[in-house]
C-alpha cells in the first residue's frame, strides 16, 4: 500500500471513544520496547510518527492511527514492564481484553516478539489468548538485523516452539533498520482488509 496520509485519530481508553468509521483495524501487541512504534513507522514510511520511547510502558492508551482513510493501526499498551503498578497492569489488561474480544472492526493482530530471544511468558500468553479467540495473528520477530542471517531459521524455530505455533498463524522476520519484511507484513495486512 502506498502511504501518504496518516493521522493519530484518537488515544482511547473506553469503547465509546473508539473511531466510528468502520475501517478495518489491525492491532499491534507486544512487550514494552519490542519495537511496535518502529514497525508502525516503517510501515507508514515515517521516521518518528508513532512515538518511539526509551521509557518502556509509555503507551497507556489504545492509539488509533488512521492510514489513508482505509484502515486503522491500533497501538496497544506494551505488556511485561515491571515498573508499572499491578493496578495499572490490571486496568490495561481489562481495556485490551475488551477491545480484542468485542471489536468487530478488528481484522487481525500483529504480535511482536524480539527475534534475538525466546518469547517471554507474556508473549506466549498473548499468542495463546489470540488463538483462543480465533483472531488472525501475524507473529513478527523484530530486530532480525541483529542476528546473523544464517541463524534466522534456528531463531524462528525456537520462537515457534515456545509459542506452540499454530499453522493458521503467519510468521515474519523483520528489521526496522533494513526494512526487511516490510512488504510481507503489508501483504498480510491487505489480505486481512479484504476479509
From Swiss-Prot:
Superkingdom per UniProt: Bacteria
Residues involved in Mg(2+) binding: 37, 59
InterPro entries: G_ENGB_dom (IPR030393), GTP-bd (IPR006073), GTP-bd_ribosome_bio_YsxC (IPR019987), P-loop_NTPase (IPR027417), Small_GTP-bd (IPR005225)
Protein name, per record: Probable GTP-binding protein EngB
Cofactor: Mg(2+)
GO cellular component entries: cytosol
GO molecular function: GTP binding; metal ion binding
Keyword terms: Cell cycle, Cell division, GTP-binding, Magnesium, Metal-binding, Nucleotide-binding, Septation
GO biological-process terms attached to the record: division septum assembly
Alphabetized NCBIfam families for the sequence: GTPase_YsxC (TIGR03598), small_GTP (TIGR00231)
Pfam entry (one): MMR_HSR1
Sequence positions that bind GTP: 30-37, 57-61, 75-78, 142-145, 173-176
Family: Belongs to the TRAFAC class TrmE-Era-EngA-EngB-Septin-like GTPase superfamily. EngB GTPase family.
Limits of the EngB-type G domain: 22-195
GTP-binding keyword on record: yes
Summary of the function given for this chain in its UniProt record: Necessary for normal cell division and for the maintenance of normal septation.
Gene label: engB
Amino acid at each position: 500500500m502506498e502511504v501518504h496520509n496518516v493521522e493519530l485519530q484518537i488515544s482511547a481508553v473506553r469503547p465509546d471513544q473508539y473511531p466510528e468509521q468502520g475501517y478495518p483495524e489491525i492491532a499491534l501487541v507486544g512487550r514494552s520496547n519490542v519495537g511496535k512504534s518502529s514497525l508502525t513507522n516503517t510501515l507508514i514510511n515515517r521516521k518518528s510518527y508513532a512515538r518511539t520511547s526509551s521509557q518502556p510502558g509509555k503507551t497507556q492508551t489504545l492509539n488509533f492511527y488512521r492510514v489513508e482513510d482505509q484502515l486503522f493501526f491500533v497501538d496497544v499498551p506494551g505488556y511485561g514492564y515491571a515498573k508499572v503498578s499491578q493496578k495499572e497492569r490490571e486496568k490495561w489488561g481489562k481495556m485490551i481484553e475488551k477491545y480484542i474480544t468485542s471489536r468487530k472492526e478488528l481484522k487481525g493482530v500483529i504480535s511482536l516478539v524480539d527475534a534475538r530471544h525466546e518469547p517471554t511468558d507474556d508473549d506466549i500468553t498473548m499468542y495463546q489468548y489470540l488463538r483462543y479467540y480465533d483472531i488472525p495473528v501475524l507473529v513478527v520477530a523484530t530486530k532480525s538485523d541483529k542476528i546473523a542471517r544464517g541463524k534466522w531459521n534456528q531463531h524462528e524455530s525456537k520462537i515457534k516452539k515456545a509459542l506452540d505455533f499454530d499453522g493458521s498463524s503467519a510468521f515474519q522476520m523483520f528489521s526496522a533498520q533494513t526494512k526487511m519484511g516490510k512488504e510481507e507484513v503489508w501483504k498480510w495486512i491487505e489480505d486481512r482488509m479484504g476479509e
